[in-house]
Amino acid sequence: MSGVSRRSILGGTAGGVLGGVVGSSVSGTSSAGATAGNATAARLRWAASWATAQTAPTAADADATSGFTDTTLRYKLRLSAGTTPPAGADALTRARPAVRLRFANPFGAAPVVVGPVTANAKPVLFGGAKDVVLAAGATVVSDPVGLILPDGADLVVSMYLPGPTGPLSFHRNVHATGSIGDRATNSVFLLTGIDVPATGRQVVAVLGDSITEGVGTPDNANLRWPDQDAARFRRRPAVANLGISGNRVLLDDGRFGPGGQSRFDRDVLGLPNLGTLVTFLGINDIQQPPSQTDPARILQAYQQLVHRAHDHDLEVIGATIGPFKGWIRYTDALDRVRNDVNAVLRQGRLFDRLLDVDAALRDPADHARLRPDFNSGDGLHPNAAGAKAIALAL
């Protein structure tokens, strides 16, 4: 990576205090969802404040497979960055504190009517209309919704689906309880992002698996490691959590979604105002059948992500693979693959910077295990304290 200039939006050294945004160059999109003729909205630059990655439904996912008719879905979601204009914001941004919602159905087979929709009880419009047709495979963005929200605020999104929708793209578990009508759900259907005015900050996207998604941390506590990083980033970059449980970097899976290489364009490059990619995948390539036992293949996949991210002028932070002794599929042979991958990553030639998750989480008495106070109980997934250790290592 020597000689390659990247926009670094996270300052400092590993374990140090994070710096602010460096520079003002952005690679985001303008508000394509703005009401026609609304020049003010069209000039706003947006940044992803909350995001999730979608998968296709399987036979085990009854709601996503059957879809909905005459149903209201409700979600309470934690934003990383708010809409409150910072000191020195331009007049346009000060005049238009707002959010924008993004919906997508990449795995759908038929058009879906979405709406009416509200955000914190305020109507969400689409080109001035109360609903929108979301074509199969398409993405739509809403008009700006005027809301003043601090960093770390919760946004309540209510979405009516007249249906019948047919099967829907969704995220299986966002570790926050919403509702389908009068019953609870941890799944989010169709909604993929919540954007806020960029106000000089860029987005950190985390491409990960169940550890990033939040398995091992309590629901509704917002203590996943990207959440805890976002809390440290106040008035700095926004954080988009693109973790999918079971996800790999190499292989696609019917239940656990397209692998990191396959979903890179849609999930990562689809984010507005992106500046940095954190890639934290690999443990499922090793431990999940069919196990990848050649470290070179995993490293090659990482290299491909780096090449593609650099093509879009993104800084890339790569994570070592954490310990998993005690997990149901642990073997010493698989752990050697993990250590071989980590040894190459620590040489510092692959990524722009390294997030040493392994060093942050391992038991000093047995490097193959999680520290006891970081173990959620299954040997693989860190608890909230372990998630904090990852956040502090960035």
Please describe what each predicted stretch is.
Residues 50, 193, 202-206, 211-303, ...:
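Conserved SGNH/GDSL esterase-like catalytic core that processes O-acyl groups on lipids
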